[in-house]
Structures are given as structure tokens and as C-alpha cells.
């Protein structure tokens, strides 16, 4: 099927030229990497990132840090595994799908071969379009990837994985099979875990809670990510996708992680009484 965007015109511009201007702003913003991706990288091994999924005016500059790193580490044809939480409650517990997703920059093809093999091997994963039709957490990552295509940095296909179930064991299973299938298919892959961090808390408490989980991610400690989210009641919407990404990346040989940037919505609105946390984190 062809999936139409559901948050174009809301989370990011629906017009090609306005979207291009917005993404360039995200890179050049004081909260962004302050430079545009300028040259094709050289793919040597899988790369993982944590990337936010709010409206671009709030989290786009933070996300740009991760996509700048992607641009420096990819070349040729690359499959992006994009894991996002299910905010809508529609569809199955964990799902992928096949087909094409439309974006203002043009169509984005799913790596149907990878998606098909993954859902057949991973018992917790379903092939289900309904989970994806209204969900924004994966969609908002695609314009950044298509922009890198516009710059001739790489050619991307992707595999969407929407996670309503985010318990520790299930998330670890998803990560295990992503790595297994990537090895079996000898794919060049990147893995994007789409999440925001604390939601609608004062800046001080949000940043303290977020620092706990960020520390766990930097230590590649998938079990502590889950433990801290539960123990400290951290309202991070995509902890399951992050756990799955960390598990997959470790199975693929990752040994280190770096915090690229952390910010909150308060840094944009200047209202620090209720903020949402955003982080860009590199795993390789």
C-alpha cells in the first residue's frame, strides 16, 4: 500500500520548499549542529541513533544532530530500521508493514524483503498496516532521510516497526531479530529509535529524570533503561524502541555511545513549568 503522511502541515511543513527551508533551519539553528550535511560518508558498520519526534520547531534541531552523524557514516544503498512507539492504540502490539510511504520530498520505499523476513522470524512481530496509518513517531523521521537523499549522500529504504508493547523481554526480542536478519541478509543498516523523553514536567525534574535514562543509554545498559523508566516513573514514550535499538546494536558490535545534544521544549517556548525532553544520541 501507499501510506499518506498524517502530520505533514502540523509537525513539519507539507510543502516541498517550506520543508526544505525548515530542515535547513534545523541544521543551522543554535540548538542544531550549526552546519548542513556537506559530503557523503563511508559506511563501515551499523549505526544507531536516538531521535525525537515532536514538531520540528521544538525537536527538529535536536534531531538534526543525529542525522548529521548519519550523513557522515553512510554511502550507497542503506536500510533504515525505524522503531517508534504507538501513540494511537490502533493495530497490533508490535508491527511492521510493506509498501511505500509518501513524503513531501517524494516516496520512501520500505525494504519489503527485510520486513518480510523479519516478521516471519520474529514471533512477537505482526505484519499490520493499521498500526502505522495514524502514527507520527516514525513518519517524522522520514523527511530527514529524504533530505540526505536530496543531497546525494545515500539512497535509503526503511523498515517501520511500531511498538505498542514495550516490556523488556519483547523489546529485547525485537532487537535480537533485527540484528539477526541484518546479518543474514548482509544489509547495510542504520537503526533509529524514535522517542521523546519526559513529558509535561517542570524543567528541573524532567532534566534530572532524563539524565538517568541517558546515562543508561550511554552505558548501553538495556536492562537499566527499563528499570529506571519504571522505578522513577519517567514518561518517556519510546523506551521500548530504544531498548530494541541498543540490543540490536550491541549484537552488531557496537561498543560506545555519545550524547550529541539534549534540550527541552522550554528552550523554545521559554515556559519551563511543563516541558518535554528531547535527546539525540549516537550508538556505534
From Swiss-Prot:
Top-rank taxon, per record: Archaea
Matching Pfam families: Memo (PF01875)
Family note: Belongs to the MEMO1 family.
Protein name: MEMO1 family protein MmarC7_0632
Species this protein is from: Methanococcus maripaludis (strain C7 / ATCC BAA-1331)
